């Protein structure tokens, strides 16, 4: 075989399709009698040489897809194609049209270098595909370009059938793009595209069909790339939330999960825990110049992974890897008996400290239980034993997060301030014994108390406590608010509710106010969202500036709930809360609504400036009643024997008692903070120096008696009568477990019940209290002397007025002097009736123009109606001198009998 025939065979071999590349290589070895071509060991060198040429990345991907073809092609593709005339021998160019780039043939090593010149006599190195396509070349350029047909055929419009791919078998594109194997070994990463080669007609060229892979279309390729990208992002999302759910569901232990989200067991879990797996989280990208205040943990807690920063501004969302646990941290966590995910195993997923029985805090406090006695958003409270003071205490362990740490520091400052002004603990505020930091947790040490008022309601099956016990709670809480609102403190509790009022003893009614974490001072208000929803005041709901009066609103809600057993305003949201308030108290004042920044949230305004309740989204006003339709009178059951009639017939629950309780609640729940009761307190018989000085500063002559509510309303102090039972007297009740027992006090006897001058047995008094009593007695003696002088002057004036015939002037002077001489502890209604009777008697006496007679009472001298009038006048004067009570009922009966036509 000469060199010309060999060249023709090589030209036909180059026109074969890539699917029959291995068979073609064997046939070519048989024809030429040479050793088959071998491929270099470095397949990557082909790609490097290929990238050095002008081929683009897209063309490289196409060549790799063509290489993914099976070793043995189906037989129907090897059918012989019709013969076509050959090109002139002088051109010596292959007729195959190359649709995809080929690696340079220079990278193929020949087994016999001496025979390589026989195959390519005119070219030393066969060039790769031309830089220009044949369509864009002229015939002259194609003639000078190796590997290109000399004549340019006219372009023909292909039909839809001709554009279909040649290989429709799906297995053609399922091979990997790394290499192509055959019987002789690995093949090249790319192949020559052409028609199948027939051994019988090896010297005849075949017709080549053009095809295009539809998967390589630009739109299809872009879509597939986007799908891959989003799929990768979703996988990273899933891995992050999967890890987050594991932290939430696992308390005090580590659980390994497989790809499906189920927990692993055995060797899989141990191997997965040993390997560090990097997870991803989606968070808002913030600048690196953020301050340390945005860090989620306390400054010493640096080992935990970062949290999601919800306060960061929304800039751009990106996927970043989270910090993984180091080997030292993992070993320390495994050695820890707690096994928590944070703080070297000492914190759980909620950043609460994992308690362990018998652990010692601050070298003196021994933890007494693994479970806390109370838990909240701030942290948890546990019971401990103080080895120094030999007493049990309560330790409040704050969460290991910076926000709670800063809030607890404010609570420490306010408690130290209140304890410094109340060293004797007279104002019912919890005592702070100390504070320290334990394993990055701020701990506060308090006195150990009993359960709270909400637990007390649960013990009564939410039937409520009696008015007597509610009055005792009101006395103590009012005293606390009076102390907190003093100018030296000016503290707003901001979270007064039954859960924050604790009993000192389960069998006593003495209480303590706790949880000053949300508190602030009047001039340093730092929170906008304060107070629990059921006890939130209207000014806070409307966004108006608030002061200490918001605690008085909360106190009114607490007192109603303690007696009825249910919250007065149980709103599910702020809008629902405002509507519940409007149902009972009516519409808020227009002045408040005009200045409220959040008024539009609850009310709409007409063109005339009238506010009305805002409609809901569905167009209806929900199921709310009209403003003021739900009466407080009916809620308390003033005339029906209490809430639901449960207190009907019980002592201390009369209509009069409920009426006074309702009036007190209405003054506490006034919309306008300026008209709301500032301070309310109930004072016992033995008064402290603080209260006594307060009375003298307000020019009050006499301290109110037992059972009176002392109210400061806009700076004016005045006594208001309460229920018939004094508050300081011990009493038992069957509606709860709280019983006040004091062996040093005597029970209230029925015979001395109406005697205001009766002195009950009291505990030994100190020197300061004795001085106060002496001062009080001296003041009373001076007052009696003044009253005697005034009466003498009145008698002299009456005689002069009778002689000068000026009755009207005498009546006015006598009424004014009588009003000044009246003791302050008498009932106002009885007082008013007696003054009117006295004025009527004096007026009729002046009209009779009789001489003044003796005012001494002698039953034997009572003759006729005129003597009965003088007896009444003498009794009135004697009552004013002795500061005693006057029997109003008998006086009214005598007045009716004597003067049937009198309108009084």
Swiss-Prot record:
Top-level enzyme category: transferase
Low complexity composition bias: residue spans: 24-35, 112-123, 749-820
Cofactor(s) needed: Mg(2+)
Predominant localisation class: nucleus
GO terms under cellular component: nucleus
Catalytic reactions on record: L-seryl-[protein] + ATP = O-phospho-L-seryl-[protein] + ADP + H(+); L-threonyl-[protein] + ATP = O-phospho-L-threonyl-[protein] + ADP + H(+); L-tyrosyl-[protein] + ATP = O-phospho-L-tyrosyl-[protein] + ADP + H(+)
Example GO BP: positive regulation of DNA-templated transcription
GO MF annotations in UniProt: ATP binding; protein serine kinase activity; protein serine/threonine kinase activity; protein serine/threonine/tyrosine kinase activity; protein tyrosine kinase activity; transcription coactivator activity
Protein family per UniProt: Belongs to the protein kinase superfamily. CMGC Ser/Thr protein kinase family. MNB/DYRK subfamily.
Protein name, entry field: Dual specificity tyrosine-phosphorylation-regulated kinase mbk-1
Gene: mbk-1
């Amino acid at each position: 075989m000469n060199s010309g025939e060999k060249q023709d065979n090589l030209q036909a071999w180059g026109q074969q399709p890539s699917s029959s590349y291995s068979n073609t290589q064997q046939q070519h070895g048989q024809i030429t009698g040479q050793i088959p071509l071998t491929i270099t060991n470095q397949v990557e060198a082909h790609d490097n040489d290929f990238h050095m040429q002008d081929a683009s990345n897209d063309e490289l991907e196409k060549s790799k897809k063509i290489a993914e073809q099976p070793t043995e092609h189906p037989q129907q593709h090897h059918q012989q194609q019709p013969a076509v005339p050959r090109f002139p021998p002088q051109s010596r160019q292959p007729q195959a049209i190359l649709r995809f780039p080929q690696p340079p043939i220079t990278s193929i090593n020949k087994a016999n270098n001496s025979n390589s010149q026989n195959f390519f006599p005119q070219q030393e190195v066969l060039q790769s595909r031309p830089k220009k396509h044949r369509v864009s070349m002229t015939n002259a350029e194609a003639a000078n370009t190796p590997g290109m047909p000399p004549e340019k055929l006219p372009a023909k419009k292909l039909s839809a059938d001709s554009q279909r791919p040649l290989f429709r078998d799906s297995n053609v594109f399922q091979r990997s793009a790394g290499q192509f194997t055959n019987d002789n070994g690995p093949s090249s990463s790319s192949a020559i595209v052409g028609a199948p080669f027939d051994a019988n007609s090896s010297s005849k060229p075949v017709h080549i069909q053009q095809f295009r892979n539809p998967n390589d279309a630009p739109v299809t390729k872009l879509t597939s790339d986007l799908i891959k990208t989003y799929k990768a992002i979703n996988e990273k999302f899933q891995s992050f939330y999967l890890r987050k759910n594991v932290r939430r569901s696992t308390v005090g232990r580590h659980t390994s999960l497989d790809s499906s989200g189920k927990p692993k067991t055995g060797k899989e879990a141990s191997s997965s825990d040993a390997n560090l797996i990097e997870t991803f989280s989606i968070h808002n990208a913030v600048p690196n110049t953020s301050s340390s205040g945005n860090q989620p943990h306390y400054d010493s807690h640096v080992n935990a992974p970062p949290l999601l920063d919800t306060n960061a501004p929304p800039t751009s969302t990106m996927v970043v890897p989270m910090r993984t646990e180091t080997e030292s941290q993992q070993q320390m966590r495994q050695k820890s008996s707690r096994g928590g995910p944070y703080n070297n195993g000492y914190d759980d997923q909620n950043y609460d400290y994992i308690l362990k029985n018998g652990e010692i805090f601050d070298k003196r406090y021994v933890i007494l239980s693994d479970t806390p006695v109370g838990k909240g958003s701030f942290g948890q409270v546990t019971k401990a034993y103080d080895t120094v003071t030999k007493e049990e205490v309560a330790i409040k362990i704050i969460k290991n997060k910076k926000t709670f740490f800063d809030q607890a520091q404010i609570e420490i400052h306010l408690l130290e301030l209140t304890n410094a002004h109340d060293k004797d603990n007279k104002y019912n505020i919890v005592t702070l014994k100390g504070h320290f930091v334990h394993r990055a947790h701020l701990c506060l040490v308090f006195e150990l108390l009993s359960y709270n008022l909400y637990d007390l309601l649960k013990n009564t099956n939410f039937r409520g406590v009696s008015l007597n016990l509610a009055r005792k709670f009101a006395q103590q809480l009012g005293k606390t608010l009076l102390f907190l609102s003093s100018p030296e403190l000016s503290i707003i509790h901001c979270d007064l509710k039954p859960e924050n009022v604790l009993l000192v003893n389960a069998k006593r009614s003495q209480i303590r106010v706790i949880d000053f974490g949300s508190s602030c001072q009047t001039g340093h208000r730092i929170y906008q969202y304060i107070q629990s929803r059921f006890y939130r005041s209207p000014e806070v709901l409307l966004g108006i500036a608030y002061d200490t009066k918001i605690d008085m609103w909360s106190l009114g809600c607490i007192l109603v709930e303690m007696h009825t057993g249910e919250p007065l305003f149980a709103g599910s949201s702020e809008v629902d809360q405002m509507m519940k308030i409007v149902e009972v108290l009516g519409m808020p004042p227009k002045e408040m609504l005009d200045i409220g920044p959040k008024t539009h949230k609850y009310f709409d305004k007409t063109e005339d400036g009238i506010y009305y309740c805002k409609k809901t989204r569905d167009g209806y006003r929900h199921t709310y009643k009209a403003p003021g339709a739900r009466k407080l009178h009916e809620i308390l059951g003033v005339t029906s024997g209490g809430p639901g009639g449960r207190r009907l017939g019980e002592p201390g629950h009369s209509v009069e008692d409920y009426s006074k309780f309702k009036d007190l609640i209405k003054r506490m729940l006034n919309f306008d903070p300026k008209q709301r009761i500032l301070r309310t307190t109930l004072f016992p018989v033995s008064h402290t120096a603080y209260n006594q000085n307060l009375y003298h500063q307000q020019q009050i002559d006499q301290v109110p008696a037992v059972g009176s509510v002392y109210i400061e309303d806009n700076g004016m102090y005045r006594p208001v009568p309460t229920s018939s039972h004094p508050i300081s007297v011990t009493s038992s009740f069957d509606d709860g477990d709280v019983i006040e027992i004091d062996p040093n006090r005597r029970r209230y006897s029925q015979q001395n019940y109406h005697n205001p001058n009766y002195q009950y047995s009291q505990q030994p008094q100190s020197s300061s209290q004795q001085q106060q009593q002496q001062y009080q007695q001296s003041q009373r003696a001076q007052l009696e002397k003044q009253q005697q002088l005034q009466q003498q002057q009145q008698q002299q004036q009456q005689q002069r007025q009778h002689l000068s015939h000026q009755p009207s002037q005498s009546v006015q002077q006598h009424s004014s002097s009588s009003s000044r001489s009246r003791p302050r502890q008498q009932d106002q209604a009885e007082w008013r009736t007696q003054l009117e009777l006295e004025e009527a008697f004096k007026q009729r006496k002046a009209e009779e123009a009789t001489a003044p007679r003796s005012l001494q009472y002698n039953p034997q001298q009572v003759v006729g109606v005129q003597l009965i009038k003088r007896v009444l006048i003498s009794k009135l004067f004697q009552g004013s001198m002795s500061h005693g009570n006057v029997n109003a009922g008998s006086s009214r009966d005598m007045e009716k009998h004597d003067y049937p036509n009198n309108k009084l």
